[in-house]
Swiss-Prot record:
Peroxidase activity is inhibited by aminotriazole and azide. It comes from Drosophila melanogaster. Ca(2+) 1 binds at D868, D870, D872, R874, E879. InterPro entries: DUOX_peroxidase, EF-hand-dom_pair, EF_Hand_1_Ca_BS, EF_hand_dom, FAD-bd_8, FAD-bd_FR_type, Fe3_Rdtase_TM_dom, Fe_red_NAD-bd_6. This is Dual oxidase. Its main location: membrane. In the N-terminal section; belongs to the peroxidase family. Ca(2+) 2 binds at D904, D906, N908, E915. Its EC number is 1.11.1.-, 1.6.3.1.
Amino acid sequence: MSVPSAPHQRAESKNRVPRPGQKNRKLPKLRLHWPGATYGGALLLLLISYGLELGSVHCYEKMYSQTEKQRYDGWYNNLAHPDWGSVDSHLVRKAPPSYSDGVYAMAGANRPSTRRLSRLFMRGKDGLGSKFNRTALLAFFGQLVANEIVMASESGCPIEMHRIEIEKCDEMYDRECRGDKYIPFHRAAYDRDTGQSPNAPREQINQMTAWIDGSFIYSTSEAWLNAMRSFHNGTLLTEKDGKLPVRNTMRVPLFNNPVPSVMKMLSPERLFLLGDPRTNQNPAILSFAILFLRWHNTLAQRIKRVHPDWSDEDIYQRARHTVIASLQNVIVYEYLPAFLGTSLPPYEGYKQDIHPGIGHIFQAAAFRFGHTMIPPGIYRRDGQCNFKETPMGYPAVRLCSTWWDSSGFFADTSVEEVLMGLASQISEREDPVLCSDVRDKLFGPMEFTRRDLGALNIMRGRDNGLPDYNTARESYGLKRHKTWTDINPPLFETQPELLDMLKEAYDNKLDDVDVYVGGMLESYGQPGEFFTAVIKEQFQRLRDADRFWFENERNGIFTPEEIAELRKITLWDIIVNSTDVKEEEIQKDVFMWRTGDPCPQPMQLNATELEPCTYLEGYDYFSGSELMFIYVCVFLGFVPILCAGAGYCVVKLQNSKRRRLKIRQEALRAPQHKGSVDKMLAREWLHANHKRLVTVKFGPEAAIYTVDRKGEKLRTFSLKHIDVVSVEESATNHIKKKPYILLRVPSDHDLVLELESYGARRKFVKKLEDFLLLHKKEMTLMEVNRDIMLARAETRERRQKRLEYFFREAYALTFGLRPGERRRRSDASSDGEVMTVMRTSLSKAEFAAALGMKPNDMFVRKMFNIVDKDQDGRISFQEFLETVVLFSRGKTDDKLRIIFDMCDNDRNGVIDKGELSEMMRSLVEIARTTSLGDDQVTELIDGMFQDVGLEHKNHLTYQDFKLMMKEYKGDFVAIGLDCKGAKQNFLDTSTNVARMTSFNIEPMQDKPRHWLLAKWDAYITFLEENRQNIFYLFLFYVVTIVLFVERFIHYSFMAEHTDLRHIMGVGIAITRGSAASLSFCYSLLLLTMSRNLITKLKEFPIQQYIPLDSHIQFHKIAACTALFFSVLHTVGHIVNFYHVSTQSHENLRCLTREVHFASDYKPDITFWLFQTVTGTTGVMLFIIMCIIFVFAHPTIRKKAYNFFWNMHTLYIGLYLLSLIHGLARLTGPPRFWMFFLGPGIVYTLDKIVSLRTKYMALDVIDTDLLPSDVIKIKFYRPPNLKYLSGQWVRLSCTAFRPHEMHSFTLTSAPHENFLSCHIKAQGPWTWKLRNYFDPCNYNPEDQPKIRIEGPFGGGNQDWYKFEVAVMVGGGIGVTPYASILNDLVFGTSTNRYSGVACKKVYFLWICPSHKHFEWFIDVLRDVEKKDVTNVLEIHIFITQFFHKFDLRTTMLYICENHFQRLSKTSIFTGLKAVNHFGRPDMSSFLKFVQKKHSYVSKIGVFSCGPRPLTKSVMSACDEVNKTRKLPYFIHHFENFG
């Protein structure tokens, strides 16, 4: 009867090669005679070779064709329970688990150290032979048996390392008596689904099959086996002579533990390729592995000779079945009786309900009894009883010298010599004592190369949660011991001290004794009652539960006759038939040595007579990585520094380009001078501690210039009005000191230069003399002592200090000292300082500088002439003091007299119209505008005469002038002379509070509020104004922190048992948490830059709930947050990689399942950083991140925008590398894609929308070069392009750098059928654009095109939604309003259904002067014409003056007021707009608007310009809103420049 196959096996059966037909074949009459063959062995091989063709050939064919192939991994042995006995199945428990916590913590928490127990009960003398003359071959064959059925001591993942305490001054491990040593112990692999609760305590797994199925020979993996097979004649691979297996050149994952005596990982290719990964551990177990490989090949060769037509697979399978059967027979019926001294009950057949699993007590305690028989060395001999010595002359090979180095052992030794030596060698005594080679010198990891097997055995029982010794006995049906002597009465009778030590060690707790200790102590001569019961029970279950057991006739593998013959096979038959050992050279019962057996051992081996074992303590896995780790840290630290240096160089490069451009532009504008310019390098001496390198330029005009290294002028030394130049040179008595030269001219501070040498000074003097002669000037040269010259030199700094003191004294004498202010001179030096001040006088240039004007301005000349009463060309201290007193305390008539005298050029006592016209022109010149023509000046003067009834006169007397200025009498009260020289104003500060404004604001009598309520109002107002920003910022950081905390908690507490957590500590929690947060932040950045989406959302009501205008600020906040977490992630991983680099190969095996390391390869820091996907991309990401963030610095963005933008395009690489970064799964599955997917799709779609116009080449309709280097470009508007006024585009020109795009605001209105931009030439690109379209250079045939990307939403585009709006533009920030104001007047004046809600709009233009914005004045002029509904009110603030009530400003105001009355337009701009001088008081203005438009609930305030401007407007809105009155001001802003 055939046994039904399992589903997997049926699939295999279909592919089985059918047995070749044998119907007509007759048996050859052969007699097989092999050396040493016995009746059983000969008959066995006869049966195998001929296929049992003793009867019917057909019978055999039928049987073999239906024979089921046994799987290698142990599955489907039991068809009802396919996983029983399979690889990675649980160890089984017969006794209840006894974990300390009931779940997984090691048992015996209160028991003594296992090393101490080992020293107490397992230490003894070597060299005591077996009581029953068991051979060493039996002792090592026991290891084969163990390897065949169990592998449950190997550490699993995660690594769990425990420390076995070592007593101080331990003779082996703590010879220095340090007391801090420990033996590392790794817990065994277990099922990850167990150990979670008391209902499912931890269960260790068996990584071998539990069956005796030849897995020691054939492995548990078919892939592994295929590497061993030759696929020729059914044999396994061997070397050419067929005696040894091949080396592991294919790098099958054999165990390649470090050799203790070498302290390094050797190549796995030196090992023999065999079925069990542990076979290279020692020479004895390796010999058995080679023996059975030969046994398989011997059978295969015999089968092939008899059946030459059989396939390789048929031969292999038949040989495998026979090898497994012979192994089963040897283990159960030969080894076990010899080991236990008793046999198993007779076989009763297959019992499918019996579980074959390896028991915990069997694996962790009972079957480890065989360790006591292991000798300290291995004898080798030949067939003539010649025992072979080692090369050093020792009688045997020391076991502890061959751990994991057995492959080289067979270079001068044969398997036969080892097997015959083991058969003659008597094992160690069967007692609790272990020989020193396994008790003190067992192999270990490189950091602890020698371990204690006895201690490890006890720890393994605790690891498996074994109960105490008595409970374990009871679970196997044995009686509990009630007294200590019950354990082993004969032993304790002969060794009573052992009993005392046992009681003391376990605190006299008999029910707390470890299973292994109790079992070993009860054994003597052979396993004790308990261990015998455990071992017999285990092997009986293995035999009876095995469906493929060779005695099971129902499996169809062997016939009863074959089974009977197989039962006769012994290990002696296998050795004699597989090796060159002859039958008389080895005893028949190889497990026992009896008198008369061949070749008795010379003596019982003792460790003292063998080669000493080396003991190398400690190993640093980080060795070799120290320098590289330092280099990596330094490199990563220098990356941002290098990026910053590159950014600095880029800024300097762009500044240099701008300077060269500026110089070229100035050269084109300036008149051409004839003559050459001579130069010389020198150092300008400023004071004792400061010098600067300068280039002195002579000419070409009559002036000497000092220029810095950037080419910028530092000082001009004018010689126009000077005839004689005084030159002093330092005396030549200081040879070692560098020479100095001093240039002194009247009305200017001195120029002191340090030259490199006296020769250089002579050269300088010669050049200066020639230059002065060329311009017809004289030079006086005198030699002065160097120190005296430097002490007397009046440098700029000294002159400045003197002038400050000059102005301060004038202020103090006029107004007195302020409260708390002290005079800054001492009494001792007061007289000298007073004299110094009295002697100081101001030149016209210094006076002009104090007024903030140029010396050639007419106003300066006139004012200087008024103050300089003695007309000596300088203003003395007394003259200046009188003027200050007059302006600060003088009467209005006195001030008017000064103005009258300024206008009276010819000093005839009257002002004619010509003189008044000249003054008007000087005032207009101050305002830096050219909008006032001759006719307008004449018209203005006639109007002023007419206003006071003097139209019949052509001149004004002083009385007439007073009459004309009568209405401005109040303004003249506060007239002062504002000077920059002093650090205080020369006006009473109370007068400065007033503002000249057209806004009539009545003072509001607010009730005084308690300061606490005022603070509360301010706080509430702040929250109300920024509620959306605060909410989304709060939401953003809550999500970011939650993501960090979630991952941190997961890796800190939920995954604390994993290897990542064990190795990296809290570092992995920090890095994984920061990875989650930075993934979120970087992904969110894409949404903030989805400009088309943001622009579109502004058209929907949702924009009321999302602060879309703040997307740039939020982009920066999210980026800075991402930067923080990126740096944290990087630093964390640097620490993590350090920890990883300090780990052993075994620990790294569990670190990740994604990376496999060769057993002889130790990855260092360079591997993790530069040879893994995660490390390499991480370094690249760090570099890209540094580049992007450094080049995003505001300074670089402003000075080198092109570099900023080009570096910012690296974000594509940032996101690609971030996606790749986690694919290696070193620390976990990649998660970046989860955050990136949504924003990435949105951003990609947004970019696709931008492509709609980006690659559309638009025709240039018209270009216009405007003053102040502005160009207006009008170009084609694409069809279906919709935009709002105030929006902006990114623009490029196909004529040059077509891929370089720059952002510009659209100045065309949405209703116009074209697009336009006003671009001021500032940088290289804008200058190229202007020069390209310059009519002098432009070729109309070139027909360049414009490409745009956008339009995108600006902060000002929602202006039309407010009934009342205030618009504030400053500097270049007026550009959006060119479009907005046009759109406003179009919407309110021509189309009542335009959707513009504005009923009143205030536009405030703040600029230093109108000079650079003539084009915008034209725009405003056009807007004023179109504004028929007067919805727009324009105010212009000119900020170039210091003070509202400065003398100049007052006169300008008077003229402006007259001109406004006369022509209804401004004298400066020609606009109806009101002009103001100075900066606006935004708070007062907003209060005025609030009061005037109290009927609305909210007013929109829109500001655009430099950051200080928008911040001041924001502050004003905050201040007004704090009053908690309606209307409420909502501020929208956009920063330019």
